[in-house]
Amino acid sequence: MGLKEIFKKQGGLNLIKQYHESGVLKTALGEFFLLGRDKKALEILRLSVQFKVKQRLEKKYKRQIQYFDENYKDKKIHEKSNKVWVCWFQGLENAPELVKKCYKSLQANLTDREIILITSENMDQYVKFPKFILEKWEKGYITNTHMTDLLRLELLIYYGGMWIDSTVLCTRKIEEISEYYFDSDLFFYQLLKPGRDGQAQLISSWLM
């Protein structure tokens, strides 16, 4: 694959803009010319850039993070919950057939769980976001994908239970699923050791 095809596939000018705004453009270019352009090299480049961004954010917000850690007091009593959270902002009636089938598979198999579908219409019944967050979402600065990242954290913090992405198909009955999926204090999939293709995933949030 040529440089032009790789550039276009990885996001083109939008990727360059994103890396520039994140302050990691030099790192990305250096890694690209150092590692090469095969699949494994590009995956390692992505991980390297992610780590660099994380370092920059930790440095930038070090004082705020330290203040939060020292002053935050969780007064909420956390109890075991049987809630399963799913989100499709447009409502199930407007969802693709894939999402409808996945949602029905949860209802059919997780029969002892309270499955709750979050939409743009009922979201404020469960969580309250600051006005500036909602305004950025309405204007498109925060995408639906990024909004669900905020939403899943708020729901799990305040209500507990499990978050499942709307495109996850459940193929086993609740009795066949290991209890630690539901009963752990915190559960998510991760891949810590890079595989042969260089892929690693610290946190995969499609099921939490």
What do the PLM-derived regions correspond to, one by one?
Residues 1-22:
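Intrinsically disordered, low-structural-confidence terminal and linker regions
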Residues 17-129:
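N-terminal anchoring/stem segment of glycosyltransferases
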Residues 75-77, 107, 179, 197-200:
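A general structural signal for short secondary-structure junctions and capping/turn motifs
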Residues 93-95, 124-127, 171-174, 178, ...:
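Short catalytic/ligand-binding loop motif for oxyanion handling, primarily in non-cytosolic enzymes
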Residues 99-100, 131-132, 177-179:
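Short, glycine/charged-enriched secondary-structure capping and boundary segments
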Residues 114-150, 154:
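Active-site-proximal specificity loops/subdomain of glycosyltransferases
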Residues 145-192, 199, 203:
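GT-A fold catalytic core of metal-dependent nucleotide-sugar glycosyltransferases
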Residues 205-207:
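Conserved hydrophobic/aromatic beta-strand scaffold that supports enzyme active sites
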